[in-house]
Amino acid sequence: MNFLLSWVHWSLALLLYLHHAKWSQAAPMAEGGQKPHEVMKFMDVYQRSFCRPIETLVDIFQEYPDEIEFIFKPSCVPLMRCGGCCNDESLECVPTEEFNITMQIMRIKPHQSQHIGEMSFLQHNKCECRPKKDKARQEKCDKPRR
């Protein structure tokens, strides 16, 4: 029963969000995404802060830490990654569906060469709030037994 109520609640929230998104496209916003001196409504704040895939700038060296001999242009790439709040301290926002995307990146080897090559990056397609893994318990399980 709780699951059904939760599902109905989130379905209505999504419907409100999509309805608002339709009207938001019709009314141009200021550079910050909001009309000047306008108060952002609670449902907008709530929906935009909940766990979901959101465009995040990711440093290429974070994804390819062993490629230190290159300089990359651009040095970071826009990727969809899980982010947001779960409204419960025991939950975390994690990806449940992922896929690879290939992008053209300039790879520069200082004083030697530069070329545009393809690099693959992991994108998050769907996210969910799931129970946090207990790090202390996990470390205990990872330790070898004597």
From Swiss-Prot:
Keyword Glycoprotein: yes
Pfam families for the chain: PDGF
GO cellular component: extracellular space; membrane
Superkingdom in the source lineage: Eukaryota
InterPro entries per the UniProt record, alphabetical: Cystine-knot_cytokine, PD_growth_factor_CS, PDGF/VEGF_dom, PDGF/VEGF_growth_factor
Gene3D superfamilies, per the entry: Cystine-knot cytokines
Transmembrane regions listed in the UniProt entry: none
UniProt signal peptide: 1-26
Molecular functions (GO terms): chemoattractant activity; growth factor activity; heparin binding; vascular endothelial growth factor receptor binding
Disulfide bonds: 51-93, 82-127, 86-129
Glycosylated position list: 100
Swiss-Prot/TrEMBL GO biological process terms: induction of positive chemotaxis; motor neuron migration; positive regulation of angiogenesis; positive regulation of cell division; positive regulation of endothelial cell migration; positive regulation of endothelial cell proliferation; positive regulation of focal adhesion assembly; positive regulation of mast cell chemotaxis
PANTHER family assigned: VASCULAR ENDOTHELIAL GROWTH FACTOR (PTHR12025), VASCULAR ENDOTHELIAL GROWTH FACTOR A, LONG FORM (PTHR12025:SF5)
Stated family: Belongs to the PDGF/VEGF growth factor family.
UniProt subunit comment: Homodimer; disulfide-linked. Also found as heterodimer with PGF. Interacts with NRP1. Interacts with isoform 2 of BSG. Interacts with CD82; this interaction inhibits VEGFA-mediated signaling pathway.
Stated role: Growth factor active in angiogenesis, vasculogenesis and endothelial cell growth. Induces endothelial cell proliferation, promotes cell migration, inhibits apoptosis and induces permeabilization of blood vessels. Binds to the FLT1/VEGFR1 and KDR/VEGFR2 receptors, heparan sulfate and heparin. Binding to NRP1 receptor initiates a signaling pathway needed for motor neuron axon guidance and cell body migration, including for the caudal migration of facial motor neurons from rhombomere 4 to rhombomere 6 during embryonic development. Also binds the DEAR/FBXW7-AS1 receptor.
Name of the protein in question: Vascular endothelial growth factor A
High-level lineage: Eukaryota, Metazoa, Chordata, Craniata, Vertebrata
